[in-house]
């Protein structure tokens, strides 16, 4: 897959996050002995960004499972983890592609087993807090 991003130098860290409030995932990179570079996604693809917040003792809601289903039958699942990869860390915003759909259903199973369902979720950002 060609991202269209070209970096020079010894690039070690990357994060996918939502930096400008449009609900589309953006990229940020670090280069050894260099500055941070951020690339805002200018594609016309449709995404739902879910910002998830935990509670005391598990502020990142590690162990939560998010499932997004569209009307055309596409299902995507993401588990919230506590790590990333070498010199990287996963952000608290999780992204789901809408494809040709305009909305879908978001289901969350929190680390304590409680379930929450949100219907008719459209492109953009959704904030969820574990209660």
Predicted regions: what they are:
Residues 1-131:
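Gly/Ser/Thr/Pro-enriched helix-cap/hinge segments flanking short amphipathic alpha-helices
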């Amino acid at each position: 897959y060609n991202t269209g991003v070209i970096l020079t130098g010894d690039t070690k860290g990357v994060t996918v996050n939502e930096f400008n409030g449009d609900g589309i995932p953006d990229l940020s990179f670090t280069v050894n002995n260099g500055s941070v570079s951020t690339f805002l996604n200018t594609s016309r693809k449709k995404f739902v960004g879910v910002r998830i917040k935990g509670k005391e003792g598990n502020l990142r809601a590690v162990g939560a499972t998010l499932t997004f289903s569209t009307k055309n039958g596409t299902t995507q699942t993401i588990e919230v983890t506590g790590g990333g990869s070498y010199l990287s860390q996963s952000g608290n915003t999780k992204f789901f592609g809408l494809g040709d759909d305009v909305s879908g259903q978001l289901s969350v199973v929190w680390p304590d087993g409680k379930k929450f369902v949100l219907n008719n979720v459209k492109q953009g950002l959704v904030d969820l807090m574990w209660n």
